[in-house]
Amino acid sequence: MKFVVITGGVVSGIGKGITTASIGRILRARELEVTAVKIDPYINVDAGTMNPFQHGEVFVTEDGVETDLDLGHYERFMDVTLSGAHNITTGKIYQRVIEKERRGDYLGETVQVIPHITDEIKSWIREVGKASGADVVLVEIGGTVGDIEGMPFYEAVRQLQLEEGRENVMFVHLTYVPYLEHVHELKTKPTQHSVKELRSLGIQPDAIVCRCERPLDDGVKRKIALHTNVPREAVIDAHDVDLVYKVPLLLERQGFGDYICERLGLDADEPDYSDWLDFVTRIEEADDEIRIAVVGKYVDLPDAYISIREALVHAGAHVGVGVDVAWVDSEALEAGDSEAWEEVKDADGVLVPGGFGKRGVEGKIEAVRYARENDVPFLGICLGFQLVVVEYARSVLGLEDAHSTEFNPDTDHPVVDLLPEQRGVKRKGGTMRLGAEPVVLEEGSLLRRLYDDREIVLERHRHRYEVNPSYVRELEDHGLRFSGHSPDGRMEALELPDHPYFVGTQFHPEFKSRPGDPSPPFVGLIKAAAGQGPD
């Protein structure tokens, strides 16, 4: 088993996740089995209770763990299914070590960062690699080198190379090379200092991947190679591209895949990018473009909806159209902002994603009503699904006070209510209905057709509230069709039969969308928005 450790320097947020996922794609193109681990040095046990404005999207794995959004990149680029074990946090590591100490596993030792914390980190990485049967384990360390919270993890991977052998562990350092416009020059000094910091921790990088606004010339690459002690061919240009799915191809063209295989002694096939190139080409050569209005409360940070965005791209490539996303603030709709409403009215389709909290909810409900009344293709996900029920109960059933008890505990018509098993639950972290659950699709329904007539599909969930079963019959008597349910009778999906495309899902279909296997509800939305009919 081989390991590739990806570290970052200079600044955070320059694309370690995409770089790691792209390395995974490069190795997968050579028919190698690859898995990935994301290390987040924060003390939170998981990402589930973190503000999306700080952290971005919470990505839910098949086994129901709330993880970092980079796991979504890994799954999409590498076409693999990962578990919650693939996201390590400081909180998880300390939790494990403290549990062992309480059990007496350390036989009276003084428990310390070295060796106990570092040993646990190494053990976790090896366990994930062994369980996956991977040829190569990618390990991405979040943050930047020098961050105090990351120190135990850098020490652990240093020890990992010492124990596994240099021939089995490779370090890739992602850095930022700024371009100063006033002198027309790319500056390498931040990279030099970043690598100096990394080497002070006992880690010599084997390759430097340089994020930059424009391509690096050969002179800059040679300068970086000289000052960071890596071969010239191991200085890789990762300049800005207009589509993240081009990044593996950009790295491959510079020989990075061959360099990794040579460095680790991997016996790999010639790379095959035919499917990947076809996907990228379909995006680039799309004749038409449609516009989808995504109505949410975190739209100032599109990373909060990154799986939504990518699922729209996947579906667009499948249908053969480009997808332009208009990010619409639901609070602005609520306030009657004319520009925000113009974005909705100019769109070919509307999507209301999941979310939490009362802020902006009425704006989302108004967006649902607009799409329903004006025959605009619509997809509601999780909270978006629940708000369809609220809007329908108010507008069609005449239950003016109808609401979710999440937002109005005293409503006379709780058409959306807390899941029975959630009553009495006090802890917030990891206690929702999470992960993959079976959904039974009704025969003859639009959703069943979109899912290739499969009766049961497995989709991922993240919610505490559900459609109140007491109102289901009345809603259906007034034309709303619940076309998907759980085996024990919970409402999982809905549609309006006489609408061009009006679908809601309690589950999150975006989490399982892949470039070569787009999510069916998203494909239906894009087809309808493009005027092709949903199925």
Swiss-Prot record:
EC number in record: 6.3.4.2
Keywords recorded for this protein, A-Z: ATP-binding, Glutamine amidotransferase, Ligase, Magnesium, Metal-binding, Nucleotide-binding, Pyrimidine biosynthesis
Ligand binding (CTP): S12, D147, I148, E149, K187, T188, K189, P190, T191, Q192, K223
Pathway(s) the chain acts in: Pyrimidine metabolism; CTP biosynthesis via de novo pathway; CTP from UDP: step 2/2
Catalytic center residues: C382, H508, E510
Positions annotated to bind Mg(2+): D70, E140
Top EC class, one word: ligase
Binding of ATP, residues: G13, I14, G15, K16, G17, I18, D70
Gene3D superfamilies from the UniProt entry: 3.40.50.880, P-loop containing nucleotide triphosphate hydrolases
Stored SUPFAM superfamilies: Class I glutamine amidotransferase-like, P-loop containing nucleoside triphosphate hydrolases
Residues given in the record as L-glutamine binding sites: G355, L383, G384, F385, Q386, E406, R464
Quaternary structure and interacting proteins, as annotated: Homotetramer.
Protein name, per record: CTP synthase
Organism, scientific name: Methanopyrus kandleri (strain AV19 / DSM 6324 / JCM 9639 / NBRC 100938)
Designated gene of the protein: pyrG
